[in-house]
């Protein structure tokens, strides 16, 4: 069992609480507002809320076309608008899923560096529990670019990319999957669940009204999709609902590399990227979904368009964290914005 001192997490949280910041209540309808930036630039990250704080881990950036893979963890305290750095990951990762399991923080899978390349999909799973980050049961198969949520006290991972053949190290070695797994903390094992209706990667997810929602994403061959799928754990059933609309500004489909959180009884999706001959671009759009009406409404655009960003909601406020500011790699940032939908 690998153990990393988690007291840094606890100390960081305590230190943040003593900083001389005054939390200001944000009102709905004012649009996205700037918050304290993540101290380092990074993209291809995920996050989860643990004890009222937002935790990110890993990621990548590509200055001068050189891929740099992160092993840092960041802890954001919304009450003080301050960041602290947590303990380093056991190994560098980009696209690792950050999720809670019954409230306990987990960091799972993602891509690491190996002799085969910088896109080696991993099976590792680490859990922060007590004063250590410990190795728990690995994934049944390598997985990256997935959706991770805490549903019914279990960590669920849905869709993503993994190698279907022996090769595992390059981006092209990975394929889109509809896999759906759930981690049982008491049994320390992953259970195979009903797969998603569509294989895709780089989607976004959230829990709302006791269900797991997966929105957007893309396929290698088909590009972005606005598809919205809902998993009902009680009936073990997937339903497909109204998709995210195409971007009015570009005509392109909002899909891959977006982020989403649930707040105020609604889903809030934003960001992402699209590819096109000669380039592509990054979305600033925000879309708000009302589950009662099965309808998406355009929300205020982010101040900084981004993809590969992280999303979380705390006390009704949605946070958009870091991400790539140009299509693909090349300009990662640490910008943080907040919205009350």
Locations of the language-model features?
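N-terminal export signals
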Residues: 2, 8-25
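Kelch-like beta-propeller repeat domains
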Residues: 5, 13, 26-341
């Amino acid at each position: 069992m690998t153990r990393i001192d988690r007291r840094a997490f606890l100390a960081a949280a305590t230190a943040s609480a003593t900083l001389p910041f005054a939390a200001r209540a944000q009102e709905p309808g004012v649009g996205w507002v700037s918050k304290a930036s993540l101290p380092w630039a990074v993209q291809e990250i995920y996050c989860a809320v643990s004890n009222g704080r937002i935790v990110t881990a890993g990621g990548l950036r590509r200055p001068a076309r050189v891929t740099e893979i992160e092993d840092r963890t960041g802890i954001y305290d919304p009450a003080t608008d301050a960041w602290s750095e947590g303990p380093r990951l056991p190994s560098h990762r980009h696209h690792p899923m950050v999720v809670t399991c019954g409230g306990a923080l987990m960091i799972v899978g993602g891509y690491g560096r190996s002799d085969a390349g910088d896109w080696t999909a991993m099976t590792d799973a680490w859990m922060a529990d007590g004063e250590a980050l410990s190795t728990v049961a690995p994934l049944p198969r390598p997985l990256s670019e997935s959706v991770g949520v805490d549903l019914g006290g279990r960590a669920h991972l849905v869709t993503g990319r993994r190698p279907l053949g022996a090769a595992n190290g390059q981006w092209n070695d990975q394929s889109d999957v509809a896999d759906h797994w759930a981690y049982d903390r008491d049994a320390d094992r992953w259970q195979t669940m009903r797969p998603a209706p569509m294989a895709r990667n780089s989607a976004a997810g959230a829990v709302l009204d006791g269900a797991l929602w997966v929105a957007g994403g893309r396929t290698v061959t088909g590009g972005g999709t606005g598809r919205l799928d809902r998993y009902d754990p009680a009936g073990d059933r997937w339903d497909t609902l109204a998709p995210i609309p195409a971007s009015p500004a570009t005509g392109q489909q909002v899909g891959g590399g977006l982020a989403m959180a649930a707040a105020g009884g609604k889903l809030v999706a934003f960001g992402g990227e699209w590819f096109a001959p000669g380039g592509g671009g990054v979305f600033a759009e925000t879309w708000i979904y009302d589950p009662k009406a099965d309808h998406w409404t355009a929300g205020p655009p982010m101040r900084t368009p981004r993809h590969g960003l992280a999303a979380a909601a705390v006390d009704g406020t949605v946070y958009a964290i870091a991400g790539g500011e140009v299509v693909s790699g090349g300009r990662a940032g640490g910008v943080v914005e907040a919205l009350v939908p």
